[in-house]
């Protein structure tokens, strides 16, 4: 897993990894999470010598990378959508070239995962979910477009999370409208 807080917080609960192992019991799967909360598709905040000793993506040679981007970038609003798409294209090219699979040295398989929706909190100090979700939908659509251009698998978790949030209002799935709690993590994993 590579990307932002949505993926990074999957480390807290383990639902996704458990369901994957349960589904593919006959496979020897290893799931590693290299997501960081502030990561964006074009910005990964690391010290300049972060990979000097050991680059984790290179060390573990992923066959498949699930990419979780779009939420942080969505704060740029509609004006940032084109830049987001271009940065995604660039990132995919860099990952394909820099991190070949261990078994064949071919490019890893990629799965682009859309950003999740925002759950309404009722807190006047936090963004209104309806407004944020319009912005997020644009970035979901942009990620889908990049995936289609590249023939890459795309998973739309935006619609699923938005529907779940609407069905059970009142911060049932997040701690603050955008970071999933355990129930939200389980819902996303399923």
What are these regions (language model features)?
Residues 14-32, 39-190:
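Alpha-helical cap/lid subdomain in secreted, periplasmic
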Residues 1-12, 37-42:
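Catalytic nucleophile-elbow at a beta strand-turn-alpha helix junction centered on a G-D-S/GDSL motif
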């Amino acid at each position: 897993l590579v990307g932002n807080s949505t993926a990074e917080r999957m480390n807290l609960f383990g639902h996704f990894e458990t369901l994957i192992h349960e589904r593919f019991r006959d496979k020897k799967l290893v799931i590693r999470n290299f997501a960081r909360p502030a990561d964006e598709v074009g910005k990964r905040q690391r010290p300049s010598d972060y990979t000097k000793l050991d680059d984790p993506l290179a060390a573990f040679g992923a066959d498949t990378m699930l990419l979780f981007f779009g939420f942080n970038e969505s704060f740029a609003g509609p004006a940032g959508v084109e830049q987001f798409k271009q940065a995604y294209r660039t990132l995919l090219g860099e990952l394909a070239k820099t991190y070949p699979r261990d078994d064949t040295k071919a490019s890893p398989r990629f799965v682009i995962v859309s950003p999740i929706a925002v759950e309404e909190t009722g807190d006047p100090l936090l963004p209104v979910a309806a407004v944020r979700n319009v912005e997020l939908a644009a970035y979901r659509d942009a990620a889908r477009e990049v995936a289609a251009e590249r023939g890459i698998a795309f998973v739309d978790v935006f619609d699923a999370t938005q529907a779940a949030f609407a069905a059970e209002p009142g911060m049932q799935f997040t701690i603050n409208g955008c970071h999933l709690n355990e129930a939200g993590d389980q819902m996303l994993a399923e």
